[in-house]
Amino acid sequence: MRPKGIDLFKVAGIQIAIDYSWIVIFLLVSWSLSAGYFPHEYPGYAWGAYLTVGVVATLLFFASVVTHELAHSLVANRLGQPVRRITLFIFGGMAHLSREPSNATAEMKIAVVGPLTSLALGALFWVCKRIVAGAGLPLLWAAVFKYLAFINVALALFNLLPGFPLDGGRILRGLLWRRSGDLRAPRRVRRIGEPASPSV
């Protein structure tokens, strides 16, 4: 059955799509940033400026989520676990793996690259923040990159929690799988990570 949603574009043969629920969270995050975070932290700008940076920051945040999922997908494709679709939805993003990894090493490689990518994006956005601030451009634009730096680091740390199906849970599953040679390790990971893992 074809997943419901809107197809946007393809990257390396992988279809990027949005679920209809994503529109709701996009509007909520844009409004929260435009009417709450940026005016509170950086007062004195016009409403139009807050709206602009709020929408731009939200788009770049979700671009970061797509990049995180693309990292998973490209590594999975290279390891023979085909991914043909990534969907953004109300709780974030999801790469649609055609099947589960065939061995513990593949499991860990596919899982760990996501948080590493988010950390790299956090560092990149922090450098952008320093460049914008040093160039004498409006502080509000430096604030956008500062927000994106922190949110990407937070995304990486959250995904490293040992709760399935977070990346940390998959890494732990791979470690248990490698150590025991037992494919039933995921059940133990779910028990270990249950308190830490909300629906994502």
PLM regions: where:
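Hydrophobic transmembrane alpha-helices and their immediate loop junctions
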Residues: 1-200
